[in-house]
């Protein structure tokens, strides 16, 4: 079930990334001609547009989206490997027929919406899968941190300002 939960979670993350990218695309298009000062290592450089700046954030998130989609596609179900990964109980049920065990794995994977199962395992899937998913999520966090830091620095320079309401 962990792999199924990971796939569902990554799918939710993917959908949110698409929504953020869509919002940034609208923002970028709206401000594509609005000039602003560009920076290199937070030192004034040359004019860019606000829209161009937003496309830099979008590019990072697009790379993250590609990684999330790759990670979802690469997930493989554990299948029916048994308590030690040998499929011993299934081999007994299928009277030693390894092909029937493989077919059972294929059917389970297909039924659960996966392209395949891991070829070899112990009782559980490899924790390398957890590390790969964590790395993917870390990449999104890095992009969000860059985006947020840029906005914060631009607020300091009053390039970007928070709106204030009359009753605030």
Task: Locate the predicted segments by residue.
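Long, non-coiled-coil amphipathic alpha-helical linker/lever segments
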Residues: 1-46, 113-129
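Internal glycine-rich alpha/beta core junctions
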Residues: 15, 46-168
């Amino acid at each position: 079930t962990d792999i199924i939960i990971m796939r569902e979670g990554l799918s939710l993350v993917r959908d949110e990334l698409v929504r953020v990218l869509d919002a940034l695309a609208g923002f970028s298009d709206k401000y594509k001609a609005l000039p602003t000062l560009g920076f290199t290592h937070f030192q004034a450089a040359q004019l860019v547009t606000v829209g161009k700046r937003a496309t830099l954030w979008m590019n990072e998130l697009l790379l993250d989206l590609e990684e999330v989609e790759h990670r979802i596609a690469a997930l493989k179900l554990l299948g029916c490997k048994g308590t030690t990964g040998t499929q011993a109980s299934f081999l007994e049920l299928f009277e030693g027929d390894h092909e029937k065990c493989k077919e059972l794995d294929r059917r389970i994977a297909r039924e659960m919406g996966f392209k395949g199962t891991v070829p070899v395992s112990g009782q559980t899937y490899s924790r390398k899968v957890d590390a790969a998913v964590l790395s993917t999520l870390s990449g999104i966090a890095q992009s969000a941190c860059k985006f947020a830091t840029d906005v914060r620095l631009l607020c300091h320079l009053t390039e970007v300002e928070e709106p204030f309401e009359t009753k605030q």
